[in-house]
């Protein structure tokens, strides 16, 4: 599909400096000054209203803002290959419906190659979405400038170009909305190797999206020598998810302090990390645990917290010997 949209050709339409739309008094002045014949004036008003309607409904600033927010969210999502029998719809897969034997039938080398194809397809799709959204922004700016022209005559003279531009922008919007949903992966080669008399199942590959894992910045807090971390996923999966939590001390000052780091598997959305150094900055990252079907994960959330200062020297026992020990406990909250 060609997403190129031709320009409006505003260079052929002379625009004066922008000003506000004609109000009722200015309309009467325009008619009194005989800028246009009455019928031509009515045509101008009808066409300008149609253009205004398009810009306030199909291409409104609020709608474009929502699309930009969705685009930013897609850049943070994780993308997976879903293997489905042809009679199942995307989202129906679970251990009961999709037996693990399906993976046992698939050639591992071919599947790894398809994961690379899936990653490339996802990257291209995100780039195309960004390009389409940029075209929508630019198109709205062009049409806004045309509406602000104080002289109706060039507007009427260039109406054919305006109509073409409206059709082009509608097509761009349709393409953008269609591409927001990950599509099917096209298989050039059989994924299932020859297994003799065994009946080969009919399968298809789809790209699916999982919402990003993000820290709860209000609930994640640092104490003197420990932190309480919380995170969430906007849309919870039907099956409980596993996460990978990483932490490290920023700007360690000794070799022993370099041991203040770790990778922790977590089966919940909350965790406490203890035996940290007081009055120091730590960086934390969270993501889903590695999955065999993951093809692209461009982003992971990170959070920096600063532990509170400890008591004055001499009032607390020495922490020597504890620097390399990083006891971690799941949160009870």
Curated annotation (Swiss-Prot):
Renumbered residue ranges of the record's region Disordered: 307-333
Cystine residue pairs: none
Species of origin: Bos taurus
Pfam families in alphabetical order: DUF5581, DUF5581_N
Protein name according to UniProt: Fibronectin type III domain-containing protein 11
InterPro entries: DUF5581_C, DUF5581_N, FN3_dom, FN3_sf, FNDC11
Fibronectin type-III domain location: 212-310
